[in-house]
């Protein structure tokens, strides 16, 4: 059953303070939690104010001078009480000029002493002068708090801003905070930027910001963020190509020109083919200098693709450089080992295992004998001899071998 009221007014009404909100019908599972009270007699609603009652539908009244009569729209039954302070609108044409004087919606939700849901008051205000000159919409939504047994609070807050048409953007901000028990604080924040134009244009959706902070899971978060970037780039690229196909198809059908229109689809050059300026400079200069309705889509796509390609190029160059360095080290080691084998071939043939009671004296005598007998004087030959001693003996003798080798060389080659 719906309550319909028709009222004519020669002039827009003035804003008046809202009366106390009338009582509302609660769900059956919440009636036991609210103390029963005798509802007061609601005041007679004026022609510009319609309120909700216990057994009737909520009525929304909208005044429009161009229609010649008031428009009354019945909403679905609501379990929430709300009241309209005033609505004043002047509409000349839906697709042309839409000057708006003032619209303000005030609603009050009774405090529910329920362990799961807690709501508060809020309002919706809409003010502007001309639809094609300046249009602003702001929604201050009350905090929505959920409380679950053995869990912490979960808070969701939303805010909407609409600025048309010179800015051509609808900003929708959604913040979600989660607190998990037995864990550190988890912050999950999502920001959405939606580009919404008039019906004759298209609607585009861009994921503007995604932030997820989880302690001890930085690597997983980084991988998820990289995947999200890939999805965003694919989505934006698909929307951009779909828009161009749509426009070209419309032009062909209207002009009956079935010529070569496919190459014109990609007539705009991608920014990664222009290496003369940096991607950030191209990105921000394009956003500031252009005001067309698809500038943000193409700018974001081009910037992300450019940044990803440059990152891939840097990684490839670094990998190539590291590979070259590794190959050079391997060649040096190969030459060193080959030189060591060629210069110490006679030493290897004369190697023998010996049980020594004085290793330092035996190492010294052996080194002196090898240097004198083979007339070793070059630095490469001495280095090969040292590497031979180090490789043929256990690790615990390395310090002694190095010390004795230094003493032998200092004594034999002292000028």
Curated annotation (Swiss-Prot):
One GO CC term, this protein: nucleus
InterPro entries per UniProt: Ovate, Ovate_C
Domain OVATE: 352-411
Keywords, sorted A to Z: Nucleus, Repressor, Transcription, Transcription regulation
Pro residues bias spans: 10-25
Note from the entry: Plants over-expressing OFP9 have no visible phenotype.
The protein's name in its UniProt record: Probable transcription repressor OFP9
Source organism (scientific name): Arabidopsis thaliana
Classification lineage: Eukaryota, Viridiplantae, Streptophyta, Embryophyta, Tracheophyta
């Amino acid at each position: 059953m719906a309550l319909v009221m028709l009222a004519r007014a020669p002039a827009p009404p003035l804003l008046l303070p809202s009366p106390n909100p009338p009582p509302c019908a609660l769900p059956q599972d919440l009636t036991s939690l609210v103390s029963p009270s005798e509802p007061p007699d609601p005041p007679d609603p004026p022609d510009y104010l319609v309120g909700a009652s216990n057994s009737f539908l909520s009525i929304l009244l909208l005044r429009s001078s161009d229609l010649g009569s008031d428009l009354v729209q019945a909403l679905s039954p609501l379990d929430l009480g709300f009241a309209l302070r005033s609505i004043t609108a002047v509409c000349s044409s839906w697709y042309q000029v839409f000057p708006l004087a003032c619209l303000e919606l005030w609603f009050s939700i009774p405090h529910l002493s329920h362990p799961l849901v807690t709501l508060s008051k809020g309002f919706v205000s809409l003010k502007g002068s001309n639809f094609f000159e300046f249009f602003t919409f702001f929604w201050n939504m009350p905090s929505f708090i959920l409380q679950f047994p053995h869990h912490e609070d979960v808070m969701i807050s939303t805010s909407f801003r609409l600025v048309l048409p010179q800015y051509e953007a609808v900003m929708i901000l959604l913040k979600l905070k989660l607190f998990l028990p037995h864990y550190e604080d988890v912050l999950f924040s999502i920001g959405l930027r939606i580009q919404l134009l008039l019906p004759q244009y298209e609607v585009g959706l861009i994921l503007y910001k995604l932030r997820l902070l989880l302690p001890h899971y930085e690597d997983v978060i980084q991988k998820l963020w990289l995947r999200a970037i890939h999805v965003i780039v694919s989505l934006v690229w698909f929307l951009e190509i779909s828009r161009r196909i749509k426009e070209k198809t419309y032009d062909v059908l209207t002009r009956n020109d079935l010529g070569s229109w496919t190459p014109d689809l990609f007539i705009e050059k991608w920014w990664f083919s222009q290496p003369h300026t940096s991607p950030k400079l191209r990105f921000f200069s394009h956003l500031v200098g252009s005001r067309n309705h698809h500038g943000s889509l193409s700018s974001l796509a081009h910037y992300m693709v450019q940044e990803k390609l440059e990152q891939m190029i840097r990684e490839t160059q670094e990998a190539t450089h590291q590979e070259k360095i590794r190959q050079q080290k391997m060649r040096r080691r190969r030459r060193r080992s080959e030189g060591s084998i060629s210069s110490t071939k006679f030493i290897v043939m004369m190697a023998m295992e010996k049980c020594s009671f004085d290793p330092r004296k035996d190492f010294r005598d052996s080194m002196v004998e090898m240097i004198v007998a083979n007339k070793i004087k070059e630095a490469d030959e001495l280095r090969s001899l040292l590497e031979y001693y180090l490789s043929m003996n256990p690790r615990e003798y390395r310090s002694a071998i190095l010390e004795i080798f230094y003493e032998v060389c200092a004594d034999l080659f002292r000028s």
